[in-house]
Amino acid sequence: RLSLVGSEMCIRDRLEAVNLYRSTNAAILSTMSKKYEGYPFGSFITYVSDKNRTLLMYTSDIAQHTKNLKTNSKACVTLFKLDTEYDKQNSSRLTLMGDLKDVPVDDLDECQERFIKFLPESKKYSSMHDFKFYKLEISRIRWIGGFGDIAWLNPKNWQDDLPRWAKNEKMMIDHMNDDHANVLQSALHAQHGIKDKNVSMIALTIDGYYVKSKENLYFISFDAPVFKPIDYRKVLVKQAKDYRSFEL
């Protein structure tokens, strides 16, 4: 469970790290080379973040990084938001270190459903027997928000305990899409500057939720993680009030 220890760094920066993690699905995976012992091996990957902050991967057994992790499960995932206007060295980046493990059999169906929801092109790989789902058990997190904004984050905040609302996710999503579409419209307008009366909620996380607008996905962030159904409702009600001026 997230402790959000105040001595690490300010909440604003922690939220920026989480928002970066939630707002992209591409990264560099580093594994320990099986062929060239002692050397790290970098690969481009796509990933999906789960309801909690678990990182999910879908990869082939014949991929070099998969061969590596079967010998040594230690891995590092680096993601970034490139600053193309100014100094690229001032770009935000997040490094997640841990061990890559098979997704448990009981969780495979749900994992596949979520993965295809975010990366529909991955569905074609499901017919190939050598593709499998993995999750990164995160043990170390390094955040760099720019010059002078550097910290090791508390790994306790990135454990894979499921929130209490997890089993109610579909019901909550259907309710928002059917009865509170205006809240989704105003949130998308407020946080991303996009006006779309046909926006729909597609997935929940402890840090916010995802909406789909014109074939693109957008992350709507919260100010703090939410674990209980009643608290999720409170945050959505608060957003509705805060973003009333953004209604279409």
Per-region residue spans from a language model:
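Single conserved hydrophobic/aromatic residue that forms the stacking wall/gate
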Residues: 1-11
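Conserved hydrophobic/aromatic beta-strand scaffold that supports enzyme active sites
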Residues: 26, 42-46, 95-97, 133-135
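A generic structural motif
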Residues: 30-34, 48-50, 80, 144, ...
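Intrinsically disordered, low-complexity regions enriched in acidic/Ser/Thr/Pro/Gln residues
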Residues: 38-39
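C-terminal edge-of-domain segments
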Residues: 126-248
